[in-house]
UniProtKB/Swiss-Prot annotation:
GO BP annotations listed: siderophore biosynthetic process
Family: Belongs to the lysine N-acyltransferase mbtK family.
Induction: Expression is induced during iron deprivation and is regulated by the transcription factor SRE1.
Protein name as annotated: Hydroxyornithine transacylase SID3
GO MF annotation terms: N-acyltransferase activity
Keywords attached to this entry: Acyltransferase, Peroxisome, Transferase
Annotated gene: SID3
Length: 439
């Protein structure tokens, strides 16, 4: 067995709020083909942690580190077909004892552990061995957690048939196979307004159109989809465990009737560091009115962000088509944008910025599966913001001359975001880096 020191070197796997359940990796054995691991429920749970509705660990489930497949011959690097790439990908061998296969949720946790260990891997193979493995293969494929091994474009008589399935990092972080309900695990279930049931208990929100026409200093006249109702004021909407900080990042729907929420916004907007860019310094009553208007506006939502239980930032998330952004950019029906400020200077720095920047965009793409682009309008000379955006897959669509500034009209496609971002560790200067394998 590994030493306790080696165990501490392995990353924790933690469910998001409201569960915060902690799981630990244990090395069961080691051999010439690498180490064999088991994911166990930690005996050292933090205060407030609760068990998920279904058992997500399996006492008889073991998996290997990612290692090269057993094939004697691999396709040449010049063959870049899906079949050839899958042949060359690393594989985890998964075994279990007993008469029943693990659940899809338990395989999801195993995949979560592997991506926590190897966040830079875009995909890998799972090779299952145990009772009802064919049924489990089919269930994982049906949930989108995995896909069948690709078929070669041309017959390959020199290669044996591979029954493994392929797991995609992009699919996993979009919520494929999530065991915590019909929405991705990182979206915290919350009631909308005075509703008695979760929106996720109903069919997907229908597509129907309405018209927004307002003649203000930034005129808007556009047809766009009717937007879903916002979560209840004060409700949590997103949560994710950040391994390199050993903290949870979360976002709550700001409640302008809550004096604590209002006072935070008021204090931050009157900070000269914030006011120079936001230009919203004012009285408490002015800020209450500002937030009330956002609360009543279906095209945007005000959000407070926190690490663990300490609020540090304010975000505005908007639908681009009925925003003034739509005047400068040909927004699609479900495109969204965001504005952000860090109000608590203790939480500045690239090691934290990378965590919340990733999470904010992650939330936007998860909240509405039809959102294909996230857009923005940072000041064209704001190098740090443009740098963080670029690290997350954004590119400058064009310059936009707004009444108060020249902006870089940036956009990031869903496909690009989930290709670029690995949700892994970061360096001391905040740039993303692959985790060193601890396996």
């Amino acid at each position: 067995m590994s030493s306790s020191r080696e165990m501490r070197d392995l990353p924790l796997v933690r469910l998001p709020e409201p569960y915060k359940t902690k799981y630990e990796l244990y090395q069961a054995s080691s051999g010439p083909n690498g180490r064999i691991f088991q994911l166990r429920l930690s005996s050292d749970q933090n205060n407030g942690a609760i068990s998920p509705p279904d058992l997500l660990h399996h006492q008889m489930l073991y998996f290997s580190e990612l290692i090269p497949g057993p094939q004697a011959t691999l396709p040449a690097e010049s063959d870049n077909t899906a079949w050839a790439r899958a042949c060359r990908s690393l594989v985890s061998f998964v075994t279990w004892d007993g008469e029943s296969a693990p659940t899809v949720g338990q395989i999801w946790m195993l995949v979560y552990a592997i991506f926590s260990l190897r966040p830079s891997e875009e995909s890998f193979r799972l090779s299952l061995s145990g009772a009802q493995k064919d049924q489990l293969y089919a269930e994982c494929n049906a949930a989108g957690l995995s896909t069948r091994f690709p078929t070669p474009v041309q017959p390959q008589p020199l290669y044996t048939t591979i029954e493994d399935v392929v797991v995609s990092r992009a699919a996993f972080w979009q919520g494929a196979g999530s065991p915590l309900g019909t929405r991705p695990a990182w979206l915290v279930p919350s009631i909308s307004g005075s509703a008695r049931k979760l929106p996720s208990e109903y069919p997907a929100f229908p597509l129907q159109y309405t018209l927004t026409s307002q003649l203000t200093n930034r005129p808007v006249h556009t047809q766009h989809p009717v937007r879903p109702a916002k979560p209840a004021r004060g409700a949590p909407i997103y949560s994710r465990y950040i391994p390199h900080l050993d903290e949870f990042f979360a976002m709550d729907h700001l409640d302008y009737t809550n004096e604590t929420h209002l006072q935070l916004f008021h204090t931050w907007q009157n900070d000269p560091r914030v006011a120079v860019n936001w230009k919203e310094a004012g009285t408490l009553d002015q800020h209450r009115e500002y937030l009330r208007k956002i609360d009543e506006d279906p095209h945007q939502i005000a959000v407070l962000a926190r690490f663990n239980n300490t609020y540090f930032a304010y975000f505005e998330i908007y639908w681009a088509k009925e925003d003034h952004m739509g005047t400068y950019y040909p927004a699609l029906d479900w495109d969204r944008g965001r504005h952000s400020l860090v109000g608590d200077a203790r939480f500045r720095g690239p090691h934290r910025a990378m965590a919340w920047w990733t999470s904010l965009i992650h939330y936007i793409f998860l909240d509405e599966p039809r959102t294909t682009c996230v857009v923005g309008e940072p000041k064209a000379t704001n190098g740090p913001v443009l740098g963080y955006d670029a690290a997350h897959g954004f590119h400058v669509h064009k310059w936009g001359d707004l009444p108060h500034k020249r902006s870089a009209m940036v956009r990031c496609e869903r496909v690009r975001f989930f290709e670029v971002v690995n949700f892994g560790n970061v360096t001391s200067n905040g740039t993303a880096k692959p985790s060193k394998s601890k396996l």
